[in-house]
Swiss-Prot record:
It comes from Thermobifida fusca (strain YX). The keyword Amino-acid biosynthesis does not apply. Pfam families: Ribosomal_L5 (PF00281), Ribosomal_L5_C (PF00673). One of its GO terms (molecular function) is tRNA binding. The lineage of its organism: Bacteria, Bacillati, Actinomycetota, Actinomycetes, Streptosporangiales. Part of the 50S ribosomal subunit; part of the 5S rRNA/L5/L18/L25 subcomplex. Contacts the 5S rRNA and the P site tRNA. Forms a bridge to the 30S subunit in the 70S ribosome. NCBIfam families: PRK00010.1. Keywords: Ribonucleoprotein, Ribosomal protein, RNA-binding, rRNA-binding, tRNA-binding. This is Large ribosomal subunit protein uL5. This is one of the proteins that bind and probably mediate the attachment of the 5S RNA into the large ribosomal subunit, where it forms part of the central protuberance. In the 70S ribosome it contacts protein S13 of the 30S subunit (bridge B1b), connecting the 2 subunits; this bridge is implicated in subunit movement. Contacts the P site tRNA; the 5S rRNA and some of its associated proteins might help stabilize positioning of ribosome-bound tRNAs. One of its GO terms (biological process) is translation. Belongs to the universal ribosomal protein uL5 family. HAMAP family: Ribosomal_uL5_B (MF_01333_B). One of its GO terms (cellular component) is ribosome.
Length: 191
């Protein structure tokens, strides 16, 4: 009997492999980067679900936490109010939302599911706006409901919850970030 010390590494996410093999050389050619470290890449994806109604009913935050953990496969962080605002009936420390920060392979897997499964399931989807960059190559967009993710069972949804998704890149300009995301498969509207 022979013992092998080989450990099977988990498979590389499909989008990460495409980025390494196709997108890096294409971006180097497009922008004329001399060093491979200059090529923009993805740093993290932040998925945020604000639940303003949780100020009146604290149980609503549990639904948001359950939805976010099902969608991202990671336990969300509860966002709490920084200070009390009487007009909104809000007290300091009250839970008002939940967010998840995805990095590494989980980030690539989530992005793949978002682009190939979730966005095409949106009714009357015409593409994402190409103007929502922040000036530093990061892109933020909002989704109006969580049902487009196949991890969520539409029959068990207690209420619609929207979410903000921020894709943080190492791109220095919006043009570089737009080119990176377009090559990754983001369906931007043609203006």
């Amino acid at each position: 009997m022979t013992v092998t010390n080989e450990i099977d590494a988990p498979p590389i996410p499909r989008l990460k492999q495409k980025y390494r093999e196709e997108i890096i050389p294409a971006l180097r050619e497009e922008f004329g980067y001399t060093n491979i470290m200059q090529v923009p890449g993805l740093t993290k994806i932040v998925v945020n679900m604000g639940v303003g109604d949780a100020a009146r009913d604290a149980k609503l935050i549990q639904g948001a936490i359950a939805d976010l953990s099902a969608i991202t496969g990671q336990k969300p962080k509860i966002n709490r109010a920084k200070k009390s605002i009487a007009q909104f009936k809000l007290r300091q420390g009250q839970p008002i939302g939940a967010s998840v920060t995805l990095r590494g392979d989980r980030m690539w897997e989530f992005l793949d599911r978002l682009l190939t499964l979730a966005l095409p399931r949106i009714r009357d989807f015409r593409g994402l706006s190409a103007k929502q960059f922040d000036g530093n190559g990061n892109y933020t967009f909002g989704l109006t409901e969580q049902v487009m993710f196949h991890e969520i069972d539409p029959d068990k949804v207690d209420r619609q919850r929207g979410m903000d998704i921020t894709i943080v890149t190492t791109a220095a300009t919006d043009e570089e970030g737009r080119s990176l995301l377009r090559r990754l498969g983001f369906p931007f509207k043609e203006d």
